[in-house]
Amino acid sequence: MAIRTFRPYTPGTRTRVVTDFNELTGRKPERSLVVSKHRLKGRNNRGVITCRHRGGGHKRLYRIVDFRRNKHDVPAKVAAIHYDPHRNARLALLFYSDGEKRYILAPAGIAIGQEVISGPKVPIETGNAMPLSAIPLGSSVHCVELYAGRGGQMVRSAGASAQVMAKEGDYVALRLPSTEVRLIRRECYATLGEVGNSEIRNTSLGKAGRRRWLGRRPQVRGSVMNPCDHPHGGGEGRAPVGRAGPVTPWGKPALGLKTRKRNKPSNRFVLRKRRRVSKRSRGGRDS
């Protein structure tokens, strides 16, 4: 997989960088694995906006992805690599030997015709799913379960992977993409390898319209609003915030405030906290 750049024929193509989609082998999704989905557009059950800057975008069909990998000891072959509009990773369509079809997250390097399998005693190969207790130290994994049988909940984004660091008792230590080291039960399943489509981090949408196609509406800075709309608003010209630090539209501290509870029960499973990301490297906007 590679990325594609464009000549500056228009302002929208000047900075546009996209993946070339050459790894995709099927244009239409498997009909038995798609369902219609009503998009909430950032609203809750009362119609109140709970997540700003969401709405519009192209119509989508939701692909049913197998995060549990609970079809043990039944081999499957990779039939196709498909696009998924709901995530930045690709999907691998599996044809099981008993005739069932399922989607899984496509690992990096997986090929058409490759055989994958899940179970407690399966070969150590990319795409195979097994308990953390059976995975060698130093291996890269993705789609990691946080609770046994619930399905993969962590490390599912494109290019992401976690590393098996140590095993002790009933727990396995994983180094997550955030650099946090966390203990997870040894019976939890994970898939070997890293998630594919890692070049997505080097892409650029190029224009505002392409962002609208994805269902993202404009983000207006608080400093250009009126005082009745945002704590940063008002003043003559480019006025400063007027507070000790930036705040959200509801007056809560923004950009750097820790929101995790100090006495959260799961803190005992965190061996090393994640690295703090500076404001400059985060590239955040005025709230």
Swiss-Prot record:
InterPro entries per the UniProt record, alphabetical: NA-bd_OB-fold (IPR012340), Rib_uL2_dom2 (IPR014722), Ribosomal_uL2 (IPR002171), Ribosomal_uL2_bac/org-type (IPR005880), Ribosomal_uL2_C (IPR022669), Ribosomal_uL2_CS (IPR022671), Ribosomal_uL2_dom3 (IPR014726), Ribosomal_uL2_RNA-bd_dom (IPR022666)
Gene3D superfamilies registered for this protein in UniProt: 2.30.30.30, Nucleic acid-binding proteins, Ribosomal protein L2, domain 3
Regions of compositional bias (Basic residues) in chain numbering: 258-287
One Pfam family per UniProt: Ribosomal_L2_C
SMART domains cross-referenced by the UniProt entry: Ribosomal_L2, Ribosomal_L2_C
Keyword Ribonucleoprotein: yes
Gene Ontology BP, a term: translation
Organism superkingdom: Bacteria
Cystine pairs: none
Any one annotated GO CC term: large ribosomal subunit
HAMAP family with a match to the protein in the record: Ribosomal_uL2_B
Family under the similarity heading: Belongs to the universal ribosomal protein uL2 family.
Quaternary structure, from the entry: Part of the 50S ribosomal subunit. Forms a bridge to the 30S subunit in the 70S ribosome.
Protein name per UniProt: Large ribosomal subunit protein uL2
Organism: Prochlorococcus marinus (strain MIT 9211)
